[in-house]
């Protein structure tokens, strides 16, 4: 699904949830700047999952990464380490690298996760794992119960991967292919 289509559909979800015009929803705006509060974010999340047939992660990418890396590697005393900055810049391609110079408070990171374009990229990444067609007969797939989709023709069912599972996979890949080689080079130097 093209990013522009995802943006348009997500803008409609946000506009409907916040009772605003869709034109007010721009890529760089934060949902809180549009008036979203915690209950609105829950409603937006649920509607996004329903309309896109995806399951958003419950934890932030940083929380997931701390589970893989362990404590103290990505953040210390409430601030990102250099490795934490590298990981987030890699995961948030729209983030301005200048915002990650100097001391970066973990608490201040929330604004990136509330930006519309961050949501759109996250949705795009999850939609990539939602099959449109059945692997058995190439007929369209339709949402079923819970984390499942069902073929409209042959009835074959699949279980969708959760956003949590996909985040863990991405972090593990980053850890194995980017962090470990970098950390090993630093130790041997």
Task: Cite the ranges covered by each PLM segment.
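Phosphopantetheine-dependent thiolation modules in NRPS/PKS and related acyl-activating systems
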Residues: 1-45, 50-189
């Amino acid at each position: 699904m093209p990013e522009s289509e995802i943006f348009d559909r997500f803008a409609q979800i946000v506009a409907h949830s916040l009772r605003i015009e869709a034109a007010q929803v721009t890529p760089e705006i934060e949902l809180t700047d549009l008036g979203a509060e915690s209950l609105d974010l829950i409603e937006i999340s649920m509607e996004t999952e329903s309309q896109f047939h995806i399951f958003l992660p419950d934890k932030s990418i940083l929380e997931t990464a701390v589970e893989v890396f362990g404590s103290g590697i990505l953040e210390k005393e409430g601030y990102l380490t250099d490795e934490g900055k590298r990981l987030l810049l890699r995961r948030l391609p729209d983030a301005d690298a200048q915002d990650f110079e100097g001391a970066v408070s973990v608490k201040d990171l929330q604004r990136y996760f509330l930006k519309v374009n961050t949501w759109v990229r996250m949705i795009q990444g999850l939609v990539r794992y939602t099959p449109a067609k059945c692997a058995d007969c190439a007929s369209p797939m339709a949402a079923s119960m819970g984390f499942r989709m069902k073929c409209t023709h042959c009835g074959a069912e699949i279980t969708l991967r959760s956003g949590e599972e996909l985040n863990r996979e991405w972090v593990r890949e980053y850890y194995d292919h980017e962090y470990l080689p970098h950390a090993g080079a630093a130790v041997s130097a």
